[in-house]
Amino acid sequence: KNVYPDLKKDFIEKGLVKIEFRHFPLDIAAFNASKIGQCNNDGKSKIMHILYSGQKKWAKGKTPEEAKANLKKFLVDEGVNLDFEKCIANKAIEDYVLNDRIEGVKKFKVNATPTIIINGKKFEKALNYKNLKKYLEKLI
């Protein structure tokens, strides 16, 4: 959230860097949000931006049912048009999200979010724009 705006301006918009998002849900609220993001993501949709920018509104709940209800209400309030229950229940999407998470652990030893992988290697420095920019400039 704090790194992305500068990264986008200085690297992505100039075609120097490409972002590839992978799901790594750490709890049921994030798992459901990942399924919604994958279900409604046509590559042009702003669903991931909506989910990330409103994370504090939906990423809560003492029970799985409460977490699901919070996410559903958030999406309605944001005007996101989708079949919520169908997306949440979609087994293929569920498998896709879980496989992203499994690959993150096995291939890159991911244990937290956010984690940055650059050219197949985990970025191990403190995640701030100064460190990331310096690292990327060495690669370009």
Regions found by a protein language model. Give the residues of each.
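Structural alpha/beta surface segment adjacent to cysteine/selenocysteine redox centers
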Residues: K1-V76
